[in-house]
A protein has these predicted regions:
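Amphipathic, soluble alpha/beta structural segments
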Residues: 147-201, 403, 427-467, 473-480
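Contiguous hydrophobic segments
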Residues: 217-226, 339, 392-407, 475-476, ...
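Short acidic/polar mixed-charge low-complexity motifs
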Residues: 26, 419-421, 497
Length: 515
């Protein structure tokens, strides 16, 4: 079965697939930055599992959720902002040198693909209610229908903020520009090589998704390779053929924390009608009971107990059933590197409690799964390899993973993270007159580099302050002071000296309540 790629339009901060009428679908995306829990206590992992279960419970009948995860994000916008602040603020030669070195080094690493930034987006998709137009349809009724859907998406956004914001996560509703950029990057993996300063210049809201973003066809690969060739890259697809037999919080990190870039995960999720599922399971239980009465096989007895437990679990509301489709796509410039990525991904899937990955050998099947993973499009007519799974199990295998970046967008200083990422920091947070100082304590053994770290922060943030005062023991910052200002002289206070720091000095003023 061959399925053609879907098409739609960007507008009013939503995506409309196949028209705003009966048979069409409407979706909106949300960028989610969850708290980084890779090394967190199990208590926090369990809390995230509960939050994700609540997220699934919020899905309405006939609505679908698509989880889009990838690790091919770029740090270029943040680096350009950092560079702009250097040009605007830095006047000291040492500060300029330090900040420029950080910019050039990290820019080169980003271009070489050695930096890694995970991105997570949630798309909520629902069918267009054609009956809402009534017997006549006009511009006013279309605007009213769009307004109703936008309000529903707004409520979903508030729900997501309440769900993940309390744990330190961030949620941002995507705009037309965000939807366009996601599709442009998704369908054009070579975009970062073209050195385009502003991709939004190519956005035309009058054109469809394919006209805006789909600039080439998929060409089949020669055997024994599987997948297809598109936009200068070889693409390979993996789909979970069997899901993990059991799960645990954090099991998805086996897939999301691999040490290479250029692969993504798409999970399409649909709620299941519980009553219909119970009726179906009851019929199957009756059939198995009849087989057991005639054959008396232990295997049939175990199947009876499993189905009876499932019926009881759903009837009591202890869990809720969902159907999911789990798609993994990898791409690379060479076939050899793509094969290596697919092998590593298969091994990671196998480590997820005996899950199995299916690699479609037919180019048609690979393309169909690719079309099923387009952002926001979770109603594909290609229905292969959907699985029934309970809510807690679905929650555990969702790729809810993020890259810790700190205050990257308005960073005063930058450091490299442990997972090929950049972490930004600020000395004050807030807006306007509501700035709050961010106090810090640096801990480490002797020779671990505490002073080196602090000097780097001082060097990068010098341009934000009129002067810097350092009170320390041992003279570790004398070289830094002389480098920033050759005329600076340290004030040395010692036990047998003539200077002291009297914090009780009123400077000749009478005592007051402030003292």
């Amino acid at each position: 079965m061959r399925v053609e790629p879907t098409d739609g339009f960007f507008g009013e901060n939503v995506i409309v697939f196949e028209g705003l009428h009966r048979g069409g679908f409407i979706t909106r995306g949300f960028e989610v930055t969850p708290s980084d829990l890779e090394n967190a206590d199990p208590v926090h992992h369990n809390a995230l599992e509960s939050d994700l279960t609540a997220l699934l419970a919020g899905l309405k009948p006939n609505h679908r959720l698509q989880v889009q995860w990838d690790n091919s994000g770029t740090f270029r916008p943040a680096l350009l902002k950092f560079r702009g602040a250097t040009v605007e603020r830095a006047t000291n030669p040492w500060t300029q040198r330090v900040r420029n070195e950080i910019f050039v080094r990290n820019w080169g690493m980003d271009e070489a693909g050695r930096l890694r930034r995970e991105r997570l987006r949630l798309y909520f998709t629902m069918p267009v209610d054609g009956d809402a137009f009534g017997p006549t349809r006009g511009r006013a009724s279309t605007a009213a229908l769009l307004s109703a859907y936008q309000e529903e998406f707004h409520q979903i956004g508030l729900f997501l903020e309440a769900l993940f914001g309390s744990a330190g996560g961030r949620v941002r509703a995507m705009t037309d520009a965000d939807h366009f950029l996601h599709y442009l990057e998704f369908l054009n993996p070579s975009l970062h090589e073209r050195k385009i300063s502003d991709p939004l210049e190519f956005f035309d809201p009058e054109k469809s998704i394919q006209e805006n973003c789909w600039h080439g066809e998929c060409r089949p690969l020669e055997k024994p390779d599987t997948g297809f060739y598109h936009d200068g890259y070889y693409h390979g697809m993996l789909v979970l053929k069997s899901l993990p037999k059991r799960t645990r919080p954090g099991i998805a990190y086996l897939l999301t924390k691999l040490g290479f870039r250029d692969y993504g995960i798409t999970v399409n999720i649909e709620p299941v009608d519980v009553e219909r599922l119970i009726d179906r399971e009851q019929k199957e239980l009756t059939r198995v009971e009849g087989d057991y009465e005639s054959l008396r096989k232990i295997k049939l007895l175990a199947a009876m107990k499993t189905k009876a437990a499932k019926i009881a679990r759903y009837s009591n509301g202890d869990s809720s059933p969902y159907r999911i489709q789990y798609i993994i796509r990898a791409w690379d410039k060479t076939r050899e590197d793509l094969r290596a990525k697919l092998t590593a991904l298969k091994a990671a899937v196998g480590n997820m409690e005996r899950a199995q990955a299916y690699e479609p050998a037919l180019e048609t099947s690979a393309r169909n799964f690719f079309y099923s993973s387009w952002p926001g499009w979770s109603f594909s007519r290609y229905t292969a390899l959907w699985h029934d799974y309970d809510d807690a199990l679905v929650a555990n295998i969702l790729p809810f993973s993020s890259t810790p970046v700190g205050h990257l967008e308005d960073a005063e200083f930058l450091f490299e993270g442990a997972n090929g990422n950049l972490v930004g920091g600020r000395t004050f947070c807030g807006e306007g007159n509501s700035l709050t100082p961010q106090n810090a304590v640096v801990l480490g053994t002797t020779g671990a580099g505490k002073s080196v770290l602090t000097i780097s922060i001082l060097s990068q943030t010098e341009c934000y302050y009129g002067f810097t005062m350092i009170a320390e023991e041992g003279g570790a910052y004398n070289v830094y002071g002389k480098t920033v200002d050759p005329h600076a002289e340290p004030i040395v206070i010692q036990a047998n000296g003539k200077l002291t720091m009297n914090y009780l000095d009123t400077r000749g003023l009478p005592l007051s309540g402030l003292h």
